[in-house]
Amino acid sequence: MNKVVLLCRPGFEKECAAEITDKAGQREIFGFARVKENAGYVIYECYQPDDGDKLIRELPFSSLIFARQWFVVGELLQHLPPEDRITPIVGMLQGVVEKGGELRVEVADTNESKELLKFCRKFTVPLRAALRDAGVLANYETPKRPVVHVFFIAPGCCYTGYSYSSNNSPFYMGIPRLKFPADAPSRSTLKLEEAFHVFIPADEWDERLANGMWAVDLGACPGGWTYQLVKRNMWVYSVDNGPMAQSLMDTGQVTWLREDGFKFRPTRSNISWMVCDMVEKPAKVAALMAQWLVNGWCRETIFNLKLPMKKRYEEVSHNLAYIQAQLDEHGINAQIQARQLYHDREEVTVHVRRIWAAVGGRRDER
């Protein structure tokens, strides 16, 4: 199995292809990407027969920006007979996966696939039973075994394969299903909530998103991101010349500072979180974020970088490299992750966590 399917946001196939070609090449896993505009997925075809499995095992999924999900697959199954679609699929998977832990029958996230998605949900139940009988799936769901993927690109036409549960997205189609809170000031609140799900392990939420923490929201108006921090019982400095939602001010947890987010300097020394969703050139935002991290003004940050019309992967890579270089120059160890989230549009969301300072005299951040 030498092909890897990567699901992405429709319209960003070229960026997804450029990224996987670059990062696979860095690991000497060579191949080429098949791209169809607005398809919502990319296929990276490796030159060596076993390199698909090697790629999804060795390249950390968390290092990918534009992929929502990935899995290795074999040849395309076409013209599945309507009276028995199950037998050919089981045949393709036998000998490839043994005792898989979960089945996901998926499609790309496009308008054209919505009808197909209804079929996938109905088809999952009988297919799961058949795969269990054949030994492809274990008799119970377990996160410790590979995930079996059946990916329909058209009626009667699918790829079959698998991903490793330790190196994939835990979400169906790579999309967390979040509900918009009725009392939130704007839909942008879902970006930050999704970022928490993607970047912070669930078992670390109580420690890293704790009650009573201090946080700063730069460019906060009307308060979509502040809302997420308030919901987790943090104290928030919301920085923006524009007004904040009164419902947030009424909580007593928000201090509204009518200032430019680029000029604001914190006076507290115990700020755990800084978040930022400002419409500005990505290089300018990256420079501001680096300044906050280098100066130790916050421990963790989540921010958005708005994307240009062209060379989006190159632009994001350049900005992330700049932040990394600034941290390295000042002896600061940090984890950097970036992802184009489901709720993002022409942007990517970045998470940086200071871990410790390698320079004497700096406070350990762990």
From Swiss-Prot:
Pfam families: FtsJ, RlmM_FDX, RLMM_N. It comes from the Bacteria. The keyword DNA-binding does not apply. It is an enzyme of class 2 (transferase). The active site is at K306. One of its GO terms (cellular component) is cytoplasm. One of its GO terms (molecular function) is S-adenosylmethionine-dependent methyltransferase activity. The keyword Nucleotidyltransferase does not apply. Keywords: Cytoplasm, Methyltransferase, rRNA processing, S-adenosyl-L-methionine, Transferase. InterPro entries: RlmM_FDX, RlmM_THUMP-like, RNA_MeTrfase_FtsJ_dom, rRNA_MeTrfase_M, SAM-dependent_MTases_sf. Its main location: cytoplasm. It catalyses: cytidine(2498) in 23S rRNA + S-adenosyl-L-methionine = 2'-O-methylcytidine(2498) in 23S rRNA + S-adenosyl-L-homocysteine + H(+). Its EC number is 2.1.1.186. GO terms for biological process: methylation; rRNA processing. Signal peptide: none annotated. S-adenosyl-L-methionine binds at S188, C221, P222, G223, G224, D240, D260, D277. Catalyzes the 2'-O-methylation at nucleotide C2498 in 23S rRNA. Belongs to the class I-like SAM-binding methyltransferase superfamily. RNA methyltransferase RlmE family. RlmM subfamily. Monomer. This is Ribosomal RNA large subunit methyltransferase M. It comes from Escherichia coli O127:H6 (strain E2348/69 / EPEC).
